[in-house]
Structures are given as structure tokens and as C-alpha cells.
Amino acid sequence: MADVEIYQSGSLTIAKAGGQQIAACQIQGNARALFKAAIDAVPSGGSLNIGKGRYVFSAPYAFPLDPDGSNLFYCSIPIIDKGMHITGAGVGQTILQLAPGQRREGRHVALMLVRGKRGFDLGYSSFGLRGITFEGASSQQNLSEQPYDGEGLLLVGSQRSNGIFENLEFRNSHAAGMYLGNNGSGPGTNETVRNVIARNCAAEGIMLDTNKGSSVSDCQAWGCRVGLFLNGNDDWQKRGSDNVTATRIKTDSQITCWQVNDFSLSQIEMDCSKAASSYGFVVRDGNGTIKNSVLKSDPTKASSYGGATYFYEQARVLLEACQIEGYFGVHAVGKSYAEAKDCNITAPGGCFCTTDPNPVQSTIIAQGCTCSGLKKALQSGSTFEER
């Protein structure tokens, strides 16, 4: 039995701790005070079970993310300075929903916020979140302002370790679905994201920002600005290995690896053919591999928006045994380095491409690949070698 339970009975939502009722509210009412009382009652390292039902929240709790008291966010469910394990009745069964009108210009919102109290305080050493749908009701929010960094349905911050996020759904977000961030305090280590679905998120469906030794598996993202975003930091050249993996991912949106060292992707199914402004599989700086994957975009879009890949700055990428289809296939610009082994590439604009409006010093090495369409579109200053 969980330490604290939340459930719906008759017309009421009820919270109990140790078998004793600690809070109640109308099912049709605002659940934010009841959930805060329930979370406060969970002991450190304890458990909270949320029963079947729809729970609707305002976002009244103001929380500054930066140490100087700036970067103010508003949230519905604050989980501060506490490691715990939260379990719902399952995706589509337990639904946590943002009430209408919570997000508006200048008012940045996260439905659930998990982190240390002050700017650089340590976060949890163990945390679990399972079996819940997060509903952002974005059609009932003010979307006049572009998504702000960190906004979303779940925002996790602070230097922390051993978080597990599985069997979750994030839908209709005004910004990100789930955002495992850091707010400058350091990485999340040994984080696991498994069996998560993101739908119709205005920013990233699934974001891992400055993570180490972490994994994403068996996840999907549909109708998001970016399906999966693995983010690093400007110190990538001296940071060492991040060791972040992603496998068995399905998405119709761009996938981005940004200043991440030692990323490893496999069994990716990315088809951006219907995305309005996708660059396909994008890598900036850092290094890593993608294997046994399908990377597709719209070959009729005669620009980088139709490209299956886009590697720039000082990215170093190995593609192995991938099916690549788009206007451009392997597209490497800036000072990037791309090596393609045993790939099947279809690209009318160039299976191997280094063209860019800016000067390039990029390199593409091809080995054992097949090409349908234009084989090479090379810009002066770049290098192409076939082995």
C-alpha cells in the first residue's frame, strides 16, 4: 500500500495518509490544494498512488528557477526537495489536466515541477513517475508567446540521480511534454525514460537537458516541434562522455542532439515528411552514433527542410545500416564530420551533401552505401571520400 492515496469517490476527490483522510475537494473543483497536501504528507522516499479519474489544476504556485530569484515559473503540482514514487492507474486512466487560462504571455507554466528548493540545491537521489496522462489543454491556453525554455507539462530540475519516468503520456502542451532540465546546477544522472508518448506539444515532446548515463527507450512523439531533444552545454569540448542512449523511438518530428558527447541512437523511426519546418535528424557539435534506423523527410522540399539529416558546427556522427530518404541524405556543413556505413540513401538533392550559404570545412566518409538520386552535392572547402 502507498504511503498516501488520492482517489475519487462519488462527487469527491479524497486524499488519505495512513488510512486517515487529510484532504477532500469536489471532483469538478480545483485539485491543486489537495495534491499539495498529499505530496507534503509523503515521507522522503515514500509513495503516492493516484487513482483513476481526471484531476484539474490551476497553477498558482510561483517558483523562481534562478538563484537570484529571477526566471519565475508557475506550477500546479510542486514537488520540492523530495524524492518519491508516484503511480497512477495507467495512461488514459489517471489524467492530470491544466485548467484553462493558466498559461499566458509572460506567465510561464509547468503543470508538475520537481526540483531542489534553491537555485543550486541538489535534487532527488531517487524518483519515480508512472502510469499517468498529462493534459495541457493547449487550445484553452494563451499561445501568443512562443514556448519559453523549460515550460511544459513536466519540468524536472536540479542536479539529481536515479529518476524513472515510464508508462506516461503528455498531450496538448503549450510547450514541452516532459523536460528533464538542470537550471545550470548540473546534470541529471542515471535517468530512465521508458514507454512515454508525447502528442501535440508546441516545443519538445521529450527533452533531456544535460543528462549523463541516461536512456530513452520505447517512446513516441507525434505532432511536436521536436520529437526527441538530447541537449548538452557549451562546455561539450571539455566535459567528457555524457553516455546518453535512445532506442526504439518513433516520431513524425525532428530529432536533435545538441552538444552531447557520446550519444548512441538505434532503431529510430523518424518520418518528418509532413512536418512544416523540420531539419530531420540534427546534430550540432558533440559526437555519437545512429544505427539500424529509418530517417525520412520530404524529398520534394528542395531545401534543408526536406533533408533527412543536418550536421553542423563541429558535430561528429557515425551512421550505420540506416535507411535515409529526403531531398538531402547525409548533409554535413560547418566543420562537421559524418561517416556513413552500409546505408541505403535516396536523395534527389544529394545523397552526400555539403552545400550551405556559409563557407564549409566539413567531411563525409562513405563506405558500403547505396545511393538513388544525385550522388554528390559538394561545396568548395569540404571533403568527400568513398571507401
Annotate each language-model stretch with its function.
Residues 14-26, 118-122, 289-290, 360-361, ...:
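Short, surface-exposed beta-strand/loop "edge" segments at domain boundaries and coil↔beta transitions
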Residues 50, 85-88, 124-129, 162-166, ...:
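All-beta strand scaffolds that present successive hydrophobic residues in beta-strands
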Residues 16-51, 56-57:
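Acidic Gly/Asp/Thr-rich repetitive segments characteristic of extracellular carbohydrate-active
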Residues 120-222:
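Right-handed parallel beta-helix
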Residues 40, 57-87, 96-130, 138-160, ...:
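Extracellular beta-strand-rich solenoid/capping regions of secreted or surface-exposed proteins
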Residues 1-8:
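Short N-terminal "domain-start" leader segments
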Residues 53-54, 90-93:
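Acidic glycine-/aspartate-rich tracts in secreted/extracellular proteins
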Residues 59-60, 97-101, 138-146, 151, ...:
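Short glycine/acidic-rich loop motifs that flank beta-strands on beta-rich extracellular proteins
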